[in-house]
Swiss-Prot record:
Its main location: cytoplasm. UDP-N-acetyl-alpha-D-glucosamine binds at residues 96, 125-129, 309, 331. It is found in: Cytoplasm. This is UDP-N-acetylglucosamine 1-carboxyvinyltransferase 1. Cell wall formation. Adds enolpyruvyl to UDP-N-acetylglucosamine. The lineage of its organism: Bacteria, Bacillati, Bacillota, Bacilli, Lactobacillales.
Amino acid sequence: MDKIIVKGGNTRLSGEVVIEGAKNAVLPLLAATILASEGQTTLTNVPILSDVYTMNNVVRGLDIAVDFDEENNTVVVDASGEILDQAPYEYVSKMRASIVVLGPILARNGHAKVSMPGGCTIGSRPIDLHLKGLEAMGAKITQVGGDITATAEKLKGATIYMDFPSVGATQNLMMAATLADGVTTIENAAREPEIVDLAILLNEMGANVKGAGTEKLVIKGVKSLHGTQHAVIQDRIEAGTFMVAAAMTSGNVLIKDAIWEHNRPLISKLLEMGVDVKEEDRGIRVKSDVSKLKPVAVKTLPHPGFPTDMQAQFTALMAVVKGKSSISETVFENRFQHLEEMRRMGLHSEILRDTAMIHGGLPLQGARVMSTDLRASAALILTGMVAEGTTTVGKLTHLDRGYYKFHEKLAKLGAQISRVSEA
């Protein structure tokens, strides 16, 4: 198993960094290719991540041809033949996002069987919203032995109100609705850029999806969808991670091809803190002087609020800003596990229900720490850059799910960082 070693204390990042295609966009895009009963679908700007390999294998398991050209960051999918209706447990069980294949398989075949991903229970909010929406469209749902089975000879258009704007549920229902009879309206839909990207692909495939990026989606069902070519949007979370890295190291970094509008919630908090953030022709430039930054209060919310996937990294930034900052997590429960690891590095923090209080500007020391999830992995590495001494970050399987050559990109910006194999 690999580990990352960071020598910190005087790191100051500078230069340019290239952002990959968005992990949170490409996974549902790959699921959408299942719907194309004619021709091939080509996705470009595909990131080389373990989650992408997993989703490719989920789609392959349906007897669909998938060709991943890593050198050119391109995936070609041919789903034009008959496809299977059961997603492979071996791969579905590895990744929560794999549940988004349920809607496309059901819409295409009239029957779908998918194991519950990641061991989550049927009553948990995200899975519940997926199933309620499909039931509203006429599907019969059963759960036996950890498997979800959905049956509908033909899905019917429906009006669906979501109790929470779940990204995954919105994506699943959008895809299912493209081949349903009639019109489907999704109220309180998720508004993330990844939703818009999916809608663009579906429309390029011949679907009729309107309202993406707003709270109300209207999907008029069509008889069939066909292959197309589509470029995956840039990863706003990777871009945000490097913005935070530049800010907390008093750096000067150009995040190439980052999209200002996609990152506006994060940028607004960086500006409030005193970070210099500017849009340039080639991306977003971040300059900072940590000694002049001010503490802030942050609350994670569904888009266009502050992204929960930036919460851990922003905590790392708060740790170096003198004064008392707070960050409230309203999207996911139990997402402060990284703070326990950061306390090993000298972080002073308290957690009261869904809010963490961060006492920033105090000395941090290098330590041996373990990643608890994908974004926590990045946060611990960033903290290691500003802590005195050496930090060793283990359990990198989380990191590889969402960041491509993260340590190499940081090293090119000036970080003293390496990745080594543990004996």
